[in-house]
Amino acid sequence: RPRRVLIVGSGFVGSEIASVCRDLDLPVTVAERGKAPLVGALGGVIGDIAAKMQLEAGVDLRTGVAVEGLEGDAEGHVRAARLSDGTVLDVDVVVASLGSIRNVEWLEGAQLASGFWGVACDAGCRAFDINGVVTDNIFVAGDVARAPHVLYEYEFRSQEHWDNAVFGAEVAANNMISLEMGRRPHLPLPSFWSGQFGVNIKSVGVCSFGDEIV
């Protein structure tokens, strides 16, 4: 049984793992660079509520800090973590929940509009080349795809969720084998849910485009 679990990052996965740890009555510390959990996805107001949920559940929440190093024993087991504020924590399980980086390195030299944020494509999942011209026979789907969304001022957005990958692949496959009149757009309404600390958090739409938080 771990003395203490350290979770690095407090996005959805990190927060859900922290919730499970508390359900199992495991001591858990969450280290987060930002001001609050979930703040990147849901904003500061919801982030403050998420922080309160964690603290009330007994999570040792540390915000505004990073993990600078891990220390182990002679057998290679982690025993301590050093935080950027100088704190040293006794831990024996560390979970890195730092998000994902899109794998576009293999596209180097392909002359596509690809980079750190993914591969740019149109609503029909067709990739753009480096000059911003849409291609006719290269299609993109999944987390790596970034397309303009009509509901959000045509801002290029990627949706990192399994259902977007499934539905995007369906649209891409349809458009690969269809003539122009048979092609259709992939314009999903962003949505997800997350169960943590006895609360089901559900989001529909994009928080930054909301008019009011109540």
Predicted region positions:
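Flexible, glycine-rich phosphate/dinucleotide-binding loops
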Residues: 14, 37, 70, 104, ...
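Mid-to-C-terminal Rossmann-like scaffold of FAD/NAD(P)H-dependent oxidoreductases
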Residues: 144-214
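Rossmann-like dinucleotide-binding cores of NAD(P)H-dependent redox enzymes
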Residues: 4-8, 12-69, 161, 185-193
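FAD-site-proximal beta/loop scaffold in flavoenzymes
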Residues: 1, 74-77, 82, 88-164, ...
